[in-house]
Amino acid sequence: IIAQYLVKPGSTVIMNYHFTTSKAHVTRLGGKVEELVIDEGLKVSSTCPFKGNIDLNKVKACVEKEGAENIAYLRLEAGTNLIGGQPISYANMKEATEYAKSLGIPTILDASLLQDNLYFIKTREESMKDKSIREITRMIADLFDIIYFSARKFGFGRGGGILVRDDSMYTEMEDYITMFEGFLTYGGMS
């Protein structure tokens, strides 16, 4: 639903790392994905505490090459499922989203593995050690235009959700729900 709403043929989605279906939806619509996780993220023996961080220099180079108007959105995954759930730091999320927003690029968080990522932020990021998990969660939520999650992770159950900051985004995305999930009036299940 998110890709259907934001991706246009020839547009680019910037990600720290893809998830299979997220990438498939983008490419199905004629967009392309740029995976810009830090180099340490793909080194098995690395002791980097946040191997899911996005490389901000690569992000800036990508935006410069493609043009901000051709970036459909910045998608960050906390943690990066396909490379072992590697966490992303709060500081990295903040810097990446501030940069994207300064150029009018929508910011999206895949929060399907957020609970583990929150633990790593609290225990590995010095500036977050005295914050509660609730406080960190709120701080992260404030960074993004859209947050979505799959509730299937960690055995929570079937389903998921999309949270949007902007009412007009909600209204426009609502039109796509019947094509993929069924009508809102019966819980979005077809």
Q: Which residues fall in each region the model found?
A:
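Conserved PLP-enzyme active-site core in the AAT-like
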Residues: 1-190
